[in-house]
Amino acid sequence: MDHAGLIVRRARTEELAACADLYVRVLRETFTWQPPERHQAADFLRAARVEEVYVAIEAGRIVGLAAFYRPQNFLHSLYVTDRGRGLGKALLDHVSAVADGPLSLKCQVANRRAQDFYRREGFACVEAGADNGVAWLRFARG
């Protein structure tokens, strides 16, 4: 995958609204088993107050984001506009490089594509549970 021209860096405050829009758009396109109104920009912006948000920039536009909660080395969000181009891997590699230790994350059981991605990247399922009726798997990479 050619990443020439792709920049991954910490999001600027003035970019958070665009990140929230990308978050909502990708969730609504991907999580088709949930009502679209469940995904709100306000949820992302609330979490961004305590998380580090990283963006992938290509040709001057945000094409992906990762939200990272440093106290737990927890990857809270990883969303890209185009799948299969290495954007998610670039963001994951960047967050892994700035983390203080091994990453963990949760993935909805219904999101098989994400599970496959994380397994390819060396993550293993270490826990299963549910919140508000939504089943999830916790993945960790040592």
Where are these regions (language model features)?
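Conserved N-terminal entry element of GNAT/NAT acetyltransferase domains
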Residues: 1-14, 139-142
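Acetyl-CoA-dependent GNAT
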Residues: 10-83, 89-94, 129
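Alpha-helical interaction/dimerization surfaces of two-component signaling modules
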Residues: 22-26, 98, 117, 121
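Short beta-strand element of the conserved SAM-dependent methyltransferase core
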Residues: 54-56, 135-141
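Glycine-/small-residue-rich active-site loops that bind phosphorylated ligands and cofactors
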Residues: 83-84, 110
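Conserved active-site alpha-helix within GNAT-family acetyltransferase domains
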Residues: 89, 93, 110-136
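Conserved GNAT acetyl-CoA-binding A-motif
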Residues: 98-110
